[in-house]
Amino acid sequence: MKIAVIGAMEEEVTILRSKLEQTNREVIANCEFTSGFYEGKEVVLLKSGIGKVNAAMSTTILLDRFKPDVVINTGSAGGFHHSLNVGDIVISTEVRHHDVDVTAFDYEYGQVPNLPAAYKADNALIQAAEDEASELGHIQVVKGTIATGDSFMSDPDRVAFIRGKFEDLYAVEMEAAAVAQVSYQFNTPFVVIRALSDIAGKESEISFDQFLEQAAKHSTDLVLRMIKRIN
């Protein structure tokens, strides 16, 4: 079993990288791939860069060259659901684009033509995350829809617009739908694990700077537990 873990930023991958043994580092198209082992499991860690194009390009390289059996996308996100607070973790049930609009041709809002409107996370990976979440103690862990777009959600008007498009949205960020779309095309199971660094629209940029490290630690803690469980 080879497990791929993808984070966009250095803060989102640094803890996991430090835990890997027998590592080998490669840089391909300015994307950093670190292969190694954690608790006897083979892991490929990708630092993808920020945004959907970087995520799609690097995930394609990852799946084509390294051929992992499963993909876990980790890192930070902005909270959308009223029940969430900074530091909470969202496990994806499905992932959607929030900045794609081809509704003029009868596609759903967020749907790329000829592809699913929503990319469903793998049930076994969701279950592994849920099983390990109970060991995290005081951290609230929920599961739900995560949406992706190439914008940081600090504008209240934009937040209200996106809320109007998706009934039950838990978190937003800038890479997961690209990772999910490429994983779907390669028929590779995936799940997204994101901890909240901010609440969308509420001084998000200030909160992000303050709480990115905490969010990265929370999401990495769960991912490390998952790696030990996945067979």
UniProtKB/Swiss-Prot annotation:
Pathway: Amino-acid biosynthesis; L-methionine biosynthesis via salvage pathway; S-methyl-5-thio-alpha-D-ribose 1-phosphate from S-methyl-5'-thioadenosine (hydrolase route): step 1/2. It catalyses: S-adenosyl-L-homocysteine + H2O = S-(5-deoxy-D-ribos-5-yl)-L-homocysteine + adenine; S-methyl-5'-thioadenosine + H2O = 5-(methylsulfanyl)-D-ribose + adenine; 5'-deoxyadenosine + H2O = 5-deoxy-D-ribose + adenine. GO terms for molecular function: adenosylhomocysteine nucleosidase activity; methylthioadenosine nucleosidase activity. The active site is at E12, D198. Its EC number is 3.2.2.9. Substrate binds at G78, M153, M174, E175. NCBIfam families: MTA_SAH-Nsdase, PRK05584.1. This is 5'-methylthioadenosine/S-adenosylhomocysteine nucleosidase. It comes from Bacillus licheniformis (strain ATCC 14580 / DSM 13 / JCM 2505 / CCUG 7422 / NBRC 12200 / NCIMB 9375 / NCTC 10341 / NRRL NRS-1264 / Gibson 46). The lineage of its organism: Bacteria, Bacillati, Bacillota, Bacilli, Bacillales. The gene is mtnN.
